[in-house]
């Protein structure tokens, strides 16, 4: 059939309480089967020996350190951080490729508003007849805003008073440490509201009833700098027989959530069948089509 960009399709499957619900459910099932999830800690070291990963060194928020041994290691951490966590046995050229991988960072400002001035001019029925889009790309060069999410349309269960209020997410693309990233939350929210007023999406700052800001580091793996040499890095990492790299940051690929999860599905399939090749894992969504196309 004719291919339609995901940005234009009218229906898709989405968790009732958002993507986090999926991971909360997975975590609960892991623990129910006897698995342990170590929270509030970060990986500070990756131990390797004879072509295998042997253990992870971790540090908790309270400064506690421990080593966690394992037979199989599935990594979704940024490739840059994964290689940086390995010891001095990593060749200098491989380490340089990993260190040079670029990213774009991301700030989202959530605003609860009384209403939007955007009208529903379609035949699509929505609660309270609000504009039906889940996301809107902003082309106005006079604002920094890049995209607007309308959470009411993702799932009405995300909004407490869905019949009279609208939760929107304003997305800004930036770099960690730049002037926008370093804005106080108060100034960031004020800027976001001012841009909406300037665009005519809301009428006045008093229309904003509540707000919340989130910063996301390394949200977008970028395809420049040392990315042109990433095949050398992939080949090196594939040399560790019990290490699998999955996900957007784990593969340094700008994939949608479904493709990112598919890399993990392929990994599990390989582990269960004894397949040693990583080709199917790295080849998810590499047909070079635009990443938001769907048959």
Model-identified regions with their sequence ranges:
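Mid-domain catalytic core of redox enzymes
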Residues: 15, 41-186, 190-201, 236, ...
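Active-site catalytic microenvironments for nucleophilic, acid-base chemistry
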Residues: 29, 36, 76, 81, ...
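Active-site/ligand-binding neighborhood in enzyme catalytic cores
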Residues: 1-46, 69
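A short coil-to-beta-strand element that immediately follows conserved catalytic motifs
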Residues: 38, 106, 203-215, 278-279
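Conserved beta-strand segments of alpha/beta enzyme cores
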Residues: 36, 67, 207-210, 242
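C-terminal lid/capping helical subdomain adjacent to the catalytic/cofactor pocket in oxidative enzymes
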Residues: 212-217, 223-295
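A structural signal for the hydrophobic beta-strands that form the central parallel beta-sheet
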Residues: 37-39, 75, 245
């Amino acid at each position: 059939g004719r291919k339609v960009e995901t940005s234009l399709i009218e229906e898709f499957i989405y968790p009732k309480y958002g993507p986090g619900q999926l991971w909360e459910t997975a975590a609960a099932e892991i623990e129910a089967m006897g698995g342990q999830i170590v929270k509030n800690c970060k990986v500070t070291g990756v131990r390797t020996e004879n072509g295998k990963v042997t253990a992870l060194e971790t540090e908790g928020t309270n400064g506690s350190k421990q080593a966690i041994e394992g037979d199989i290691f599935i990594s979704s951490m940024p490739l840059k951080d994964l290689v940086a966590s390995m010891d001095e046995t990593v060749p200098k050229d491989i380490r340089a490729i990993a260190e040079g991988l670029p990213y774009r960072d991301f700030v989202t400002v959530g605003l609860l508003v009384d209403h939007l001035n955007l009208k529903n001019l379609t035949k699509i029925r929505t609660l309270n007849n609000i504009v039906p889009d889940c996301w809107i790309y902003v082309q106005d060069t006079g604002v920094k805003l890049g995209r607007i999410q309308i959470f009411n349309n993702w799932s009405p269960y995300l909004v407490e008073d869905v019949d009279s209020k609208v939760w929107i997410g304003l997305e800004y693309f930036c770099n960690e440490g730049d002037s926008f990233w370093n804005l106080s939350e108060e100034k960031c929210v004020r800027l976001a509201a001012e841009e909406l007023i300037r665009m005519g999406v809301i009428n006045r700052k008093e229309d904003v009833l509540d707000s919340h800001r989130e910063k996301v580091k390394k949200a977008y793996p970028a395809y420049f700098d040392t990315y042109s040499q990433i095949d050398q890095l992939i080949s090196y990492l594939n040399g560790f027989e019990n290490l699998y790299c999955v996900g957007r940051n784990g593969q340094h690929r700008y994939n949608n959530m479904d493709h990112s999860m598919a890399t993990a599905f392929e990994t599990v399939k390989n582990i269960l069948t004894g397949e040693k090749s990583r080709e199917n894992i790295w080849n998810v969504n590499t047909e070079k089509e635009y990443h938001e196309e769907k048959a």
